Amino acid sequence: AILLNNNGHHVNVWSVFPDEVELLAKERENKKCLPGVHIPENIEFSADTEYVVEKSDVIVLAVASPYTRSTAKLFAPYVKKGQYIVNVGKGIEEDTLMTLCQVVEQEIPQCTAAVLSGPSHAEEVGRMIPTTCVIGTHKKEDAEYLQNIFMNDVFRVYTSPDMLGICIGGALKNVIALAAGIADGLGYGDNTKAALITRGITEIARLGIAMGADPMTFTGLTGIGDLI
């Protein structure tokens, strides 16, 4: 939200929890997730789903993966044909094994779905630390339109038509990251983590290719970059 506000866009932040909306609007700081980062006064907060969706040209969907479908269902009645929905969550839906973008497209077929992913910790983006990401859409012109909205001097955005590969890389890297954390906890060293990373990205790429993704996606920001 801060990034888009700094780029000159009017931003409405939505939450399903009215108490959270009221607290953020009053304190102008997310003390739980982004302590010390001031939220500009011109960013609005609302729990009114219809108002926020209908007022927006681009919706950035930033919810935990188990709630992607329920949130998409909540938005669906108000989304206009062709309206952009950019998913930034990472995961696979447990019951269906669908990517989060596939879930969005299933629940909101009238939207233009996109995914923004890469090595991008929210707290670093909020503090304007240089970051690079990839935006994926089915059509090149949509990717370039969204690229111009998000990109600035400290947030570099590349484009890709491989939405499937971007989603797979972002979701499956979590498994390898957990393994690397376990290796740390067991007192293992760099040798072990190097093996986990290199063999892990190989497994991710094999699965992605089998599902129809572009092999090159997994050597880039949303593959090895996100994993590191």
Identify the residue ranges that each predicted region occupies.
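Internal alpha-helical scaffold of NAD(P)-dependent oxidoreductase catalytic cores
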Residues: 67, 78, 103-111, 130-216
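Cofactor-binding loop segments of dinucleotide-utilizing enzymes, especially the Rossmann-like FAD-
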Residues: 16, 90, 138
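C-terminal substrate-binding/catalytic lobe of Rossmann-fold NAD(P)-dependent oxidoreductases
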Residues: 212-228
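NAD(P)+-binding Rossmann beta1-loop-alpha1 motif at the extreme N-terminus of oxidoreductases
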Residues: 1-37, 43-47
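Short, charged/polar "capping" segments at the starts of alpha-helices
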Residues: 19-23, 94-95, 143
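Rossmann-like NAD(P)(H) cofactor-binding subdomain of soluble oxidoreductases
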Residues: 39, 45, 49-54, 58-130, ...
